Amino acid sequence: LGRFFFWLCRTRPEVVKKRLLDELPELLPEGYDIEKHLTPRYNPWDQRVCLAPDGDFFNAICEGKADIATDHIAEIKENGVELKSGEFIEADIIVSATGLDLNFLGNIEVTVDNEAVEPANLLNYKGMMYSGIPNLLASFGYTNASWTLRCDLTSKYLCRLINYMDRKDISRVMPTPDMSQVEFEPLLDFSSGYVVRKSAELPKQGSIKPWVMYQNYIADIFLTRFSALQDGALKFTK
């Protein structure tokens, strides 16, 4: 169901957005400003979609236990937050929900043959390896599903790869794209600020398999479990 909803958001975003907004008046107090507080500038799944189990978030608003302030922050003060509109919100605790800083491999400095590797020049292979870096697999989960799903596929693919290399007495494997056939695209098709801010510094995905970074668990099952290891993109050496 989650996969179908994601597909629908990508293929019919205006239809899904309208349906979601049409359901809100029944969940909120009469006259609540839905356009101001609950109508984002982007379409569903251009950024993450938040779910409210059993409508608990909307119940809290109806009961006066929660409220939404849609504005820009002018200043954080000792006892609350001042907004650009001049409104002041008193607060005992402020929880930061933004400001994530994406870093490739946790800012590990990677070198190959004493040459520093620039992450922005790398091409992702099957969501787990990178062009120009030998013998490296890294888990990178899904933006639209459980993060561990692709981690599980990556670990199983790694076992396949190691067993194959052991049988063939191979010590080195490296994704090597034909650059005349592949166009670079952003690694994540996501408009969240923390992604956009770092997009230019992160590795890229390609326009064709196996360089595409799928956000589709079913597609990745076939790509990792049933595809040939000798696919022309991996370069094996002894």
Description of each model-found segment:
Residues 1-78, 159-188:
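Dinucleotide-binding/catalytic capping subdomain of oxidoreductase cores
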Residues 67-69, 95, 137-139:
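Hydrophobic/aromatic beta-strand patches that form the interior of the parallel beta-sheet core
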Residues 84-93:
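Core beta-strand elements of the Rossmann-like FAD/NAD(P) dinucleotide-binding domain
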Residues 85, 98-99, 140:
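Glycine-rich, N-terminal phosphate-binding loop of Rossmann-like dinucleotide-binding domains
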Residues 96-113:
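Flavin (primarily FAD) binding-site architecture
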Residues 119-125:
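Alpha-helical scaffolding within the catalytic cores
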Residues 124, 135-238:
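C-terminal, flexible cofactor-proximal segment of oxidoreductases
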Residues 126-132:
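Short glycine/proline-enriched loop/turn "hinge" motifs that connect secondary-structure elements
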